[in-house]
């Protein structure tokens, strides 16, 4: 949406989640598996995916990647290149601000330690979804 010229902000973020929800829900209704990689820092955001699952009569599984090592988190953030120039990468201050505003989880989720190697994280996630 930002690439199409929409202004950055809460309303655009909600609209983006809703656009992805519609696509996810359509695929769930077709019996396909959907993986959404999103911050989900509020219950409103999480409920977006719960609504998609409910509409498709499909269970939703949340996997929370957690990285408590601040130095490693900063290193990964500063080394990250998603190739989405219209988005840009968040600053450390922006990440900290979102962390401070992060709403507690209501309902089940699985937490995975992201300080592990990529292979270990992938193995853990696959174990959870099987």
Predicted segments — roles?
Residues 1-30:
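Conserved substrate/cofactor phosphate-moiety recognition/catalytic segment
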Residues 25-29, 53-58, 102-104:
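Conserved catalytic network of the ASCE P-loop NTPase/AAA+ motor domain
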Residues 37-45:
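Acidic, metal-coordinating catalytic cores used for nucleic-acid/nucleotide bond scission
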Residues 44-60:
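Short, electropositive alpha-helical surface patch
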Residues 56-77, 112:
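Conserved phosphate-donor/acceptor-positioning beta-strand/loop module used by diverse small-molecule
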Residues 79-124:
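Small-molecule kinase domains that catalyze NTP-dependent phosphoryl transfer to phosphate-bearing small molecules
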Residues 124-130:
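C-terminal alpha-helix
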């Amino acid at each position: 949406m930002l690439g199409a010229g929409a202004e950055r902000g809460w309303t655009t973020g909600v609209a983006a989640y809703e656009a992805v929800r519609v696509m996810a829900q359509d695929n769930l209704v077709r019996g396909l598996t959907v993986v959404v990689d999103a911050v989900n820092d509020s219950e409103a955001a999480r409920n977006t995916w719960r609504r998609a699952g409910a509409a498709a009569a499909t269970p939703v599984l949340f996997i929370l990647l957690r990285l408590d090592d601040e130095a490693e988190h900063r290193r990964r953030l500063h080394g990250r290149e998603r190739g989405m120039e219209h988005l840009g990468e968040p600053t450390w201050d922006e990440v900290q601000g979102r962390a401070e505003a992060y709403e507690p989880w209501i309902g089940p989720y699985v937490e995975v330690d992201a300080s592990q190697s990529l292979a270990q994280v992938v193995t853990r996630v696959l174990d959870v979804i099987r």
